[in-house]
């Protein structure tokens, strides 16, 4: 198994994407600490991977003291951290009509929570001389607003990718890798969204593969990126957009 004897933390583990990554880590042999804001959602994920759960904790990933206390509560090594915490975003409004607060909010959210979680764990990883920090971006970081009015979400994702590169440059000498995942829209993370058929068709036609990524695929890619097989990869953004964005 790719992650046997590894210890991972997943922030935002109660969400669809965080849960998918937690399950993938568990399937590859990791002990997984689940953290998020809603206990019931975390417990639902924990019930799927009972043998792999290290702990379940209610943690506000926007609060530095909450995250620092959580990291300190975990004994021994921390090999992997993944942040899947959602941001507050207003979309489907033209930029020229969007308020400053609505534009800036997702950028602040993304920068704050990823900075807090990654630096809290990086301090431990620097001491132990190794580890992997994973962040979640989106193809929105590379797309225009010609088809969809994304508000501040594009800039939020771009900030995550910038942080990935900056942190990778700083902590690499300690054996710590930093990688971002950039999927396109994943329909199975939002089954409650009623997307019109023509809208979904437009999304499909905009990809080289003619389909959209699935959350399980993102989870398995995260597991690979966190494994020793991906040892040379750092400061990189893994393109999981099915070709919606071509690097």
Roles of regions detected by a PLM:
Residues 223, 234-247:
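Short C-terminal tail/terminal secondary-structure segment
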């Amino acid at each position: 198994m790719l992650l046997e004897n590894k210890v991972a933390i997943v922030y935002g583990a109660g969400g669809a994407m965080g849960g998918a990554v937690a399950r993938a880590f568990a399937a590859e042999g990791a002990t997984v600490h689940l953290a998020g804001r809603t206990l019931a959602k975390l417990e639902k994920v924990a019930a799927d991977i009972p043998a792999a759960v290290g702990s379940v904790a209610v943690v506000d990933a926007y609060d530095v003291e909450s995250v620092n206390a959580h990291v300190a509560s975990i004994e021994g090594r921390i090999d992997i951290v993944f942040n899947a915490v959602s941001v507050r975003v207003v979309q489907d409004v033209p930029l020229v009509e969007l308020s400053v607060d609505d534009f800036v909010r997702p950028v602040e959210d993304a920068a704050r929570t990823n900075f807090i979680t990654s630096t809290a764990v990086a301090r431990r990883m620097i001491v132990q001389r190794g580890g992997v920090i994973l962040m979640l971006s989106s193809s929105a970081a590379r797309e225009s607003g010609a088809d969809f009015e994304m508000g501040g979400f594009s800039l939020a994702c771009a900030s995550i990718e910038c942080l990935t590169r900056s942190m990778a440059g700083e902590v690499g000498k300690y054996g710590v890798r930093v990688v971002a995942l950039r999927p396109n829209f994943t329909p199975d993370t939002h089954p409650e969204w009623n997307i019109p058929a023509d809208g979904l068709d437009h999304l499909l036609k905009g990809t080289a593969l003619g389909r959209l990524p699935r959350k399980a695929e993102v989870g398995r890619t995260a597991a690979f990126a966190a494994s020793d097989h991906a040892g040379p990869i750092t400061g990189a953004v893994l393109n999981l957009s099915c070709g919606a964005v071509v690097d």
